[in-house]
Regions:
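Beta-propeller-forming repeat regions
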Residues: 1-237
């Protein structure tokens, strides 16, 4: 993930165990991560101010652990001293077969949603919405920055239809963002998107990359799909 972690106006990078300051790009510690069968247990790092203190924190998911954690930016002094970022639980999804995640604004309200992809084909696809947590701080009292200002609320797009591969983009041409997975795509309803299942179109059967990309490659006015082969070679559209 890319963003201004240290507040110096330059973009920095976050990747797994380390963050890299824009300019010298030297690795600096962020968190400890276990290995799983040769994989680093991290497959989705994203930057967001989770506690409302004005600094970018990290939200991260993984393969088999079911929890989504956020890691608290330690601020100027903590970053300078190379302190690990404090880990906090954001939500336990109860899902342990996660291929990858995206943090993307799906409904256009300016706040991103958390989308989880599974390598299992016939399991639900779930979007987790970040909603405002009720404020607990009393007037005049300094907010507790160890607490997230968001809660995560699940919305199941469909009971079946997932599989290796994940993207977001407008496939139907209605101006709304749809969700693409390895077995097809979910069409965002024109109204009440979070109050109903989304229509699933089983238009393909891919073992594809995370992410895939939706863009109009041939300039014919509709969204095309660029994808890599998951755990294989090749880039196709």
């Amino acid at each position: 993930a890319a963003g201004d972690v240290d507040g110096d106006g330059k973009p920095d990078l976050v990747a797994g165990r380390n963050w890299y300051r824009g300019g010298d790009w030297a690795p600096r510690p962020l968190r400890s991560i276990a290995d799983w069968n040769g994989y680093v247990e991290s497959n989705g790092d994203y930057l967001l101010d989770v506690n409302g203190d004005g600094r970018l924190d990290v939200i991260a998911g993984s393969f088999t652990p079911t929890e989504i954690h956020w890691y608290e930016n330690p601020g100027e002094q903590g970053l300078r001293l190379g302190k690990h970022w404090k880990q906090h639980l954001l939500v336990d999804t109860k899902n342990s077969r996660n291929e990858g995640q995206l943090l993307q604004d799906i409904d256009g309200d300016g706040r991103p949603e958390w989308i989880v992809n599974s390598w299992i084909k016939n399991v639900p696809t779930v979007i987790w919405r970040l909603t405002d947590k009720p404020k607990s701080a009393k007037p005049g009292k300094k907010p507790d920055t160890s607490q997230a200002i968001y809660e995560m609320q699940p919305h199941q797009l469909g009971e079946k239809g997932n599989g290796h591969g994940l993207a977001v983009g407008d496939i139907s041409g209605d101006g709304l963002t749809d969700v693409l997975v390895g077995q097809g795509w979910y069409e965002q309803p024109k109204e009440n998107a979070w109050g109903q299942p989304w229509k699933f179109h089983a238009d393909w059967d891919l073992h594809a990359s995370v992410p895939m990309i939706v863009t109009d490659l041939d300039q014919d006015g509709d969204g095309d799909l660029i994808f890599g082969k998951g755990h294989d070679y090749g880039l196709l559209w």
